[in-house]
Amino acid sequence: MTVDTDKQTLGFQTEVKQLLQLMIHSLYSNKEIFLRELVSNAADAADKLRFEALVKPDLLEGSGELRIRVDFDKDARTVTIDDNGIGMSREDAVSHLGTIAKSGTADFLKHLSGDQKKDANLIGQFGVGFYSAFIVADQVDVYSRRAGLPASDGVHWSSRGEGEFEVASVDKPERGTRIVLQLKEGEESFADGWTLRNILKKYSDHIGLPIEMRKEHYGEDADKPAEPEWEVVNRASALWTRPKSEIKDEEYQEFYKHVAHDAGNPLAWSHNKVEGKLDYTSLLFVPGRAPFDLYHRDSAKGLKLYVQRVFIMDQAEQFLPLYLRFIKGVVDSADLSLNVSREILQSGPVVDSMKSALTKRALDMLEKLAKDKPDDYATFWRNFGQALKEGPAEDYANREKVAGLLRFSSTHDTTGAQSVALADYVGRMTEGQDKLYYLTGESYAQIKDSPHLEVFRKKGIEVLLLTDRIDEWLMSYLTEFDSKSFVDVARGDLDLGKLDSEEDKKAQEEVAKSKEGLASRIKAALGDDVAEVRVSHRLTDSPAILAIGQGDLGLQMRQLLEASGQAVPETKPVFEFNPAHPLIEKLDAEQDMDRFGDLSRVLFDQAALAAGDSLKDPAGYVRRLNKLLLELSA
């Protein structure tokens, strides 16, 4: 390799400077991750070369045997990671190693918790793994040449992690990247064959290409041969191609960490080989935690796609529906061509058939997790429940299956935890109940004592309490489960069916008839703010409620539309009053029209507050309430 020429000194992007300081001064409890990250990057470089060489075989430069080499020099206190993958041009080195184009660094810094172990685990997830080299090194030198460029177009990138880096042109006959770490004082233990082999075994055994280290000679063989002998220190076979019976849980877990860029263990996995009409292997994982960008429109999602063990692309989104975007893993097909493109993957019988089967496989995996490990499923639900709730709208064919995986709070459990499955609810239904009742609201605390629940508590009927912002939208698609319809208890057309006896219904009709005059007076007082005023048959303790009018949007859906800047259609609630409540009896007896109007307005505003709505005229409400309080205290 010739001497550096055309040398430049450049400054790191501001966020990278912050990141380097963090790496150097904070993440020192789990130092060995540097090797995991650099080897993972080298494996990705090999995958990229394989893919590009499908179209341009010349990129292989006569050598298609890809490998990673890890070496060390005790005396010089260096560790070297060398690959013969795709390599980098000078421009690549500046852009990839000096700046971070995406918002990965800023997001990484924002998500730091102060817990070293947790923070170290975030490194790969946020695509900043290269900088972990500075945990153990006070100087990092990168020598690289992109495949297809002449030897004279090599690049030497160098930095001490202090805010600047140097980049220079250099001759590099071999394509690929060599990273030389000058270890800090006190980190000499990493310049050791046994230590490096153990770290590689722990983190990188699953990598699908050989990781080589120099053969070490001891005792009588201590004299090193003239040429170093290299030996493979990992299994170097694609994990998913091996029989399930031969793979340990720890191997699946390490493979997940590599494929998902996550240092935590998965909650579950499913490894399957399909033969017959289609021939493919899949290995799917359920992560243990949600990525920071799960709900970002342009977040990374999809499976790693291989065709006949040749890497084709990351993030092949076509094999799973969007609501399962959190599933990680690989699919290796023998039915797709090696020159498959994202456009070709958009449709077609092979892709559609694989998507259908993989979706079912993923849902089966979640069902098994829920059944066998409910605590782990609760963890899954906390992380990914809202994404799964998109399922009934997106995946009609699996609507019932997805519904069975959903979890809600309910009046059966006073903790407010989202732990109730629909099958649990159905199993607890009372005699004569043929509907599944639910109530939506902003929070469990806000709706657990809602007046809408009073009649259900009286009759001992469980009501699901839906408090995620997506829930009302979800229920517009999830209309039934187990052949039983869902009913929103906040709607004005609530019918309890067989749960009300004929005697109850007759008595209700008589009371409604006797209070028609009061209903008319209240309607006149409230005017156009209500669609209708009527006697309520659902209240036992509260004086009044506001029910949702027929065909109107509920409060949650209106708030969702407002937040997204969409026009919200005008709605008018139904005002229902409890004729047996003392306040309503006083209202009925009130002859002063102004006072009657004030009382009616106060009851209307209180009902709106109880429903979680905001008041159109809060100052008017306070004024009327103060006036009534003064009269009471006079």
Curated annotation (Swiss-Prot):
Classification via InterPro entries: HATPase_C_sf, Heat_shock_protein_90_CS, HSP90_C, Hsp90_fam, Hsp90_N, Ribosomal_Su5_D2-typ_SF
Lineage: Bacteria, Pseudomonadati, Pseudomonadota, Gammaproteobacteria, Lysobacterales
Organism from which the protein derives: Xanthomonas campestris pv. campestris (strain 8004)
Name of a matching Pfam family: HSP90
GO CC field: cytoplasm
Subcellular location: Cytoplasm
SUPFAM superfamilies named among the record's database cross-references: ATPase domain of HSP90 chaperone/DNA topoisomerase II/histidine kinase, HSP90 C-terminal domain, Ribosomal protein S5 domain 2-like
Cross-referenced PANTHER family: HEAT SHOCK PROTEIN 90 FAMILY MEMBER
Residue segments, region B: 343-559
Domain of life: Bacteria
Protein name: Chaperone protein HtpG
Family recorded in the similarity comment: Belongs to the heat shock protein 90 family.
Region (A): 1-342
Function (record text): Molecular chaperone. Has ATPase activity.
Location of the region described as C in the Swiss-Prot/TrEMBL record: 560-634
Gene Ontology molecular functions: ATP binding; ATP hydrolysis activity; ATP-dependent protein folding chaperone; unfolded protein binding
Signal peptide: none
UniProt keyword ATP-binding present: yes
Subunit: Homodimer.
Keyword vocabulary terms for this entry: ATP-binding, Chaperone, Cytoplasm, Nucleotide-binding, Stress response
